Regions:
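Active-site activation/catalytic loop segments of kinase-like enzymes and analogous catalytic loops
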Residues: 41-86, 100-118
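Conserved acidic
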Residues: 2, 74, 92
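Pocket-edge positions in alpha/beta enzyme catalytic cores
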Residues: 35, 67-70, 124-127
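Conserved NTP-binding catalytic cores of kinases and kinase-like/nucleotidyltransferase enzymes
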Residues: 4, 16-26, 87-90, 147-167
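All-alpha amphipathic helical-bundle segments outside canonical DNA-binding/catalytic cores
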Residues: 89-100
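Regulatory N- and C-terminal appendages and interdomain linkers associated
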Residues: 106, 110, 114-167
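Active-site acidic catalytic loop and adjacent metal/ATP-binding pocket
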Residues: 1-41, 45-47
Length: 167
């Protein structure tokens, strides 16, 4: 992908929407983590927060954005729309998705560490250890699915190669 300025913390609570046209972003907050990087890393990070109606109960219970509501895009629809609008492409979206999940797991771990060591007392953080494990499992599932797909593709190529080999 190409390099650009990435925000590094895209979430609904970091954008200001136009009250007269709530689908129009008129401001972006929280730029302290901005840097130069791959725009698909930003997308992967943003979608790690994206909870869909089909996600497991842990993600639904800890959801902090309205991404599950009727009419909202699925993660895949967001990716497809983003790639279409930007003209970018990727042969390995799973890499970016897993990166975003790993990044979110690290953030959750940092928050839980502070809660566990009584550096913060917000009760919302007491069960973050569960979220960390759920994110880990979600990342492993995505990696596993990608390996299965890669293996199936490899098997097709091997079969095709065998057809082309002299007997």
């Amino acid at each position: 992908s190409k390099t650009c300025i990435i925000h590094n913390d895209w979430r609904f609570d970091n954008v200001i929407l136009d009250p007269k046209n709530p689908t129009q972003v008129i401001g972006v907050l929280d730029w302290e983590m901005a840097t130069l990087g791959d725009p698909l890393m930003d997308l992967g990070s943003a979608l790690a927060y994206w909870v869909e109606d089909t996600d497991n109960q842990i993600f639904k219970a800890t959801r902090r954005q309205p991404t599950h509501l009727k009419g909202m895009f699925t993660r895949q629809q967001v990716v497809d729309y983003y790639l279409q609008k930007t003209g970018l492409s990727t042969d390995n979206w799973t890499f970016y998705e897993v990166f975003g999940i790993f990044r979110l797991a690290v953030i959750a771990q940092q928050i839980y560490y502070r809660y566990y060591h009584k550096q913060t007392n917000n009760p919302a953080f007491k069960d973050f250890w569960i979220v960390i494990h759920a994110l880990h499992i979600r990342a492993l599932k995505l990696i596993g699915l990608q390996k299965i797909e890669a293996n199936e593709l490899a098997q097709k190529y091997i079969a095709k190669f065998k057809e082309l080999m002299p007997k």
